């Protein structure tokens, strides 16, 4: 398996499996001189960790992070930063019924056909458990971006199943388990999930992420465009089946006179481009949305086949999120932050001395 590393100058390599002794990552390319403690990382991991409400998996993992290297006396040294998170609440016996059978909608069948071996315990390497190290690395990226450029990366749930969640205020996002920016709609979301759990079924969600304060100029055309790398990173998150930048698929029905964001001395009029033009950041907010499919592990019996190709019925008994989108907000934030820090360093390496006579206009004229 060779696709375990994200990034070019700021790289993150993850390791581990869902039911192994530990999971973690190695971060290479983090600039030296930044203050960093385990507490800086833990606060982000706590936002993602399981067992925090009745609406998510009841697997009880503390997700306590250990910094093994790359930090001396609370300051990054510029050497690789190794993060370790120990698994403490595995129940491998829950997966005994799928040793010879593939779960529909999971990576079981494809991993088996590609590698000729698979870890059936919780999906092994393909488990969303492996997003914890991504959030850990994302905490490092967020801190550097915030301190160096004033960049803030924030996300929220904008849709759960067929329930739209109108944005009200960022202050509500951290006050409920859904990362909803609308406190009034939380009871409806809770009732929806309670009914879904009784049905033994699952549902999908939409997560919106916004990066504010990104300077103009980040991105490496043609094949490492900023939006292309964002899309790749987001599609690397478990269960993500769609990514939109800016207006996204709504652009199809927009006329050019509407979609094209006009420029004025006071700033851009509109942000249908989502903060990226020609693969390069414009200085506006970078806006990203992801579509997350329903959890494939459900208690409803499903048709499948065995390794021998015989027909079988699969019913999943492990502890699973009825909607993986509920805990996906900090993961999506982290992925965006990892792409941004990588491109910040790449821009500094090649174009850090470039200056033009054109004023940098503000992100919005309104």
Swiss-Prot record:
It comes from Burkholderia ambifaria (strain MC40-6). Pathway: Metabolic intermediate biosynthesis; chorismate biosynthesis; chorismate from D-erythrose 4-phosphate and phosphoenolpyruvate: step 7/7. This reaction introduces a second double bond into the aromatic ring system. Its EC number is 4.2.3.5. GO terms for molecular function: chorismate synthase activity; FMN binding. GO terms for cellular component: cytosol. InterPro entries: Chorismate_synth, Chorismate_synth_AroC_sf, Chorismate_synthase_CS. Reduced FMN (FMNH(2)). It is an enzyme of class 4 (lyase). Keywords: Amino-acid biosynthesis, Aromatic amino acid biosynthesis, FAD, Flavoprotein, FMN, Lyase, NADP. This is Chorismate synthase. PANTHER family: CHORISMATE SYNTHASE (PTHR21085:SF0).
């Amino acid at each position: 398996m060779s696709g375990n590393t994200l990034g070019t100058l700021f790289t993150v390599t993850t390791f581990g499996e869902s039911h192994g002794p530990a999971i973690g990552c190695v971060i290479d390319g983090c600039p030296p001189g930044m203050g960093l403690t385990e507490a800086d990382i833990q606060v982000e991991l706590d936002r993602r960790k399981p067992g925090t409400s009745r609406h998510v998996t009841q697997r009880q993992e503390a997700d306590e992070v250990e910094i093994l290297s790359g930090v001396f006396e609370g300051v990054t040294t510029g050497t690789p930063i190794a993060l370790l998170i120990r698994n403490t609440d595995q129940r491998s016996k829950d997966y005994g019924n799928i040793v010879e059978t593939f779960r529909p909608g999971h990576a079981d069948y494809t991993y088996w056909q590609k590698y000729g071996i698979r870890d059936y315990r919780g999906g092994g390497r393909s488990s969303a458990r492996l997003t914890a190290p991504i959030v850990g690395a994302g905490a490092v990226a967020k801190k550097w971006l915030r301190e160096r450029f004033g960049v803030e990366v924030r996300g929220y749930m904008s849709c759960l199943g067929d329930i739209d969640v109108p944005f009200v205020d960022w202050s509500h996002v951290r006050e409920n388990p859904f990362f909803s920016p609308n406190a009034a709609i939380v009871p409806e979301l809770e009732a929806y999930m309670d009914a879904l759990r009784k049905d033994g079924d699952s549902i999908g969600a939409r997560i919106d992420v916004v990066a504010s304060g990104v300077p103009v100029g980040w991105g490496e055309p043609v094949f490492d465009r900023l939006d292309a790398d964002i899309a790749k990173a987001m599609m690397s998150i478990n269960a993500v089946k769609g990514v939109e930048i800016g207006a996204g698929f709504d652009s199809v029905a927009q006329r050019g006179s509407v979609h094209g964001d006009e420029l004025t001395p006071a700033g851009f009029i509109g942000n249908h481009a989502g903060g990226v033009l020609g693969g390069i950041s414009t200085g506006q907010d970078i806006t990203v949305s992801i579509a997350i499919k329903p959890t494939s592990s459900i208690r409803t019996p499903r048709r499948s086949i065995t390794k021998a190709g015989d027909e079988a019925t699969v019913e999943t008994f492990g502890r699973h999120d009825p909607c993986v989108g509920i805990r996906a907000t900090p993961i999506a934030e982290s992925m965006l932050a990892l792409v941004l820090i990588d491109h910040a360093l790449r821009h500094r390496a090649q174009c850090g001395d470039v200056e033009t006579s054109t004023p940098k206009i503000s992100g919005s004229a309104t």
